[in-house]
């Protein structure tokens, strides 16, 4: 069938046998159409033409929510894609779903979850929800688009309670070499994207909504505001000749300091409050990684630097070395308590007490596979991965009960409740905050999983692919909304 010819019969009133008059509060649309086409496309029209008083009428008037969109829908029965309005996309979509529901037509409710609705359209969203029914997808959309300072008291406690599960205080940020992208952790929808001028070598979160970015072959550190999506400052010092070849970067939250290392074996400390360099230290080895201690604040255990063969230096608040650990490790990370280091290679796994300066526990790595990464998945639980990002073993280490059980290990044992929610597949990048019980995991360089306060989000695929880093940021609006909802429910 040639739908274009069929549609021309409508324009030319050829073989038409009924006139449909669509009326809304403002507009009126007249269409000469074919009963057979409408009845075969919609149960509503089949019933209208066969079961009611309109059966033998040549002109039928129908009162609809929007006459123009309703006419577009009837045109779609003739294989046409028509938009006869000048509405913004969000308005057209909401009204279209009301009209589709009125005509008893099927629609894909998932499309709604990606809509961004301005404050002036929120009442239309609620109207649409009342028309097509409150369901998970609609509730997600409502939760995401509630305007600031909206009067939440119009909602019942039951409905407010149902909205809470669709509101998350955090968003996910992915770095893709040339772009920074922010995603809604619940829906997986991209909220915003920031294009970069060049590929970056390092990216680090340095505040609630600030990230530091170092480009390849650049001698500057750019501070980006994720809210304004703009460079708010540039850190640069002409006296540091090798700063263009930075090898590592970390953020000391308690002091608001940014620590960088470069190929000239220098450790450089920036005060982000004054945007000035406050310390330049010469070290006798190339630093490959810097890891900040975000769990506890001590004068002597601020962060660690890791050099060749995982040789470790522990740094104090004056940026002097408080301890050195020379051990042939392949991977190193802080424990959940921040008081110990977990060290591992192809032969063993060790727990090193930083305060005491000694090994608390050592066990053989009888997988004989060299670990290349370790992820603190929650509290005192860890997964070690090999060079192919495949899991090697699963660790439980509880520093509070170290005298009773120091280390439990079983190869490929993923029966922990957390791990049940994440497939034990290849992991490329992760970000966590054990204090806030947050973990984000990236697999296959594009698939994101998250767990926040024990609740699973994802998986969802992000674009562009080839994620080079991942972290999370608090959503101020969502946090305020949750607080308002909780206060209302508490006082009702």
From Swiss-Prot:
<feature type="domain" description="BTB">
    <location>
        <begin position="16"/>
        <end position="86"/>
    </location>
</feature>
<feature type="repeat" description="WD 1">
    <location>
        <begin position="241"/>
        <end position="281"/>
    </location>
</feature>
<keyword id="KW-0853">WD repeat</keyword>
<dbReference type="InterPro" id="IPR015943">
    <property type="entry name" value="WD40/YVTN_repeat-like_dom_sf"/>
</dbReference>
<comment type="similarity">
    <text>Belongs to the mimivirus BTB/WD family.</text>
</comment>
<dbReference type="InterPro" id="IPR000210">
    <property type="entry name" value="BTB/POZ_dom"/>
</dbReference>
<dbReference type="InterPro" id="IPR036322">
    <property type="entry name" value="WD40_repeat_dom_sf"/>
</dbReference>
<dbReference type="Pfam" id="PF00651">
    <property type="entry name" value="BTB"/>
</dbReference>
<feature type="repeat" description="WD 2">
    <location>
        <begin position="286"/>
        <end position="325"/>
    </location>
</feature>
<keyword id="KW-0677">Repeat</keyword>
<dbReference type="InterPro" id="IPR011333">
    <property type="entry name" value="SKP1/BTB/POZ_sf"/>
</dbReference>
<protein>
    <recommendedName>
        <fullName>Putative BTB/POZ domain and WD-repeat protein R786</fullName>
    </recommendedName>
</protein>
């Amino acid at each position: 069938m040639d739908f274009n010819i069929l549609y021309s019969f409508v324009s030319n009133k050829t073989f038409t046998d009924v006139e449909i008059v669509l009326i809304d509060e403002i507009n009126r649309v007249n269409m000469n159409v074919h009963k057979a086409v409408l009845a075969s496309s919609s149960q509503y029209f089949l019933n209208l033409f066969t079961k009611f008083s309109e059966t033998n009428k040549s002109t039928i008037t129908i009162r609809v929510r929007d006459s123009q969109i309703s006419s577009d829908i009837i045109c779609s029965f003739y294989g046409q894609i028509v938009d006869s309005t000048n509405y913004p996309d969000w308005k057209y979509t909401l009204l279209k779903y009301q009209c589709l529901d009125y005509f008893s037509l099927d629609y894909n409710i998932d499309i709604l979850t990606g809509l961004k609705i301005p404050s002036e359209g929120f009442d239309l969203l609620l109207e649409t929800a009342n028309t097509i029914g409150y369901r998970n997808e609609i509730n997600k959309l409502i939760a995401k688009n509630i305007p600031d300072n909206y009067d939440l008291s119009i909602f019942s406690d039951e409905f407010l309670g149902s909205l809470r599960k669709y509101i998350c205080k955090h968003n996910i940020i992915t770095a893709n070499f040339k772009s920074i992208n922010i995603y809604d952790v619940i829906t997986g929808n991209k909220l915003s994207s920031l294009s970069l001028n060049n590929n970056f070598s390092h990216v680090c979160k340095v505040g609630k909504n600030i990230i530091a970015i170092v480009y390849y072959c650049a001698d500057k550190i750019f501070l980006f505001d994720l809210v304004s999506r703009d460079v708010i400052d540039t850190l640069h010092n002409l006296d540091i000749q090798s700063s263009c070849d930075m090898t590592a970067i970390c953020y000391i939250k308690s002091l608001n300091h940014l620590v960088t290392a470069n190929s000239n074996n220098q450790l450089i400390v920036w005060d982000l409050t004054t945007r000035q360099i406050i310390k330049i230290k010469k070290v006798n080895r190339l630093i490959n990684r810097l890891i900040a201690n975000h769990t506890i604040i001590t004068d002597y255990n601020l962060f660690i630097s890791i050099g060749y063969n995982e040789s470790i230096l522990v740094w104090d608040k004056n940026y002097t070395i408080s301890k050195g650990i020379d051990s042939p490790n392949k991977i190193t990370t802080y424990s959940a308590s921040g008081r110990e280091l977990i060290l591992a290679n192809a032969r063993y796994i060790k727990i090193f007490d930083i305060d005491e300066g000694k090994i608390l526990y050592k066990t053989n790595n009888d997988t004989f596979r060299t670990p290349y990464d370790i992820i603190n998945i929650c509290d005192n639980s860890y997964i070690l991965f090999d060079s192919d990002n495949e899991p090697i073993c699963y660790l439980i280490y509880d520093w509070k009960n170290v005298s009773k059980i120091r280390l439990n290990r079983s190869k490929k044992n993923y029966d922990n409740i957390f791990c049940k929610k994440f497939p034990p597949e290849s992991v490329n990048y992760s970000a966590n905050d054990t204090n806030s019980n947050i973990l984000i995991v990236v697999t296959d360089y594009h698939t994101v999983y998250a767990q926040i306060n024990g609740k699973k989000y994802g998986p969802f695929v992000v674009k562009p692919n080839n994620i080079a880093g991942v972290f999370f940021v608090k959503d101020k609006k969502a946090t305020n909304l949750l607080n308002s909802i909780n206060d209302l429910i508490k006082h009702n």
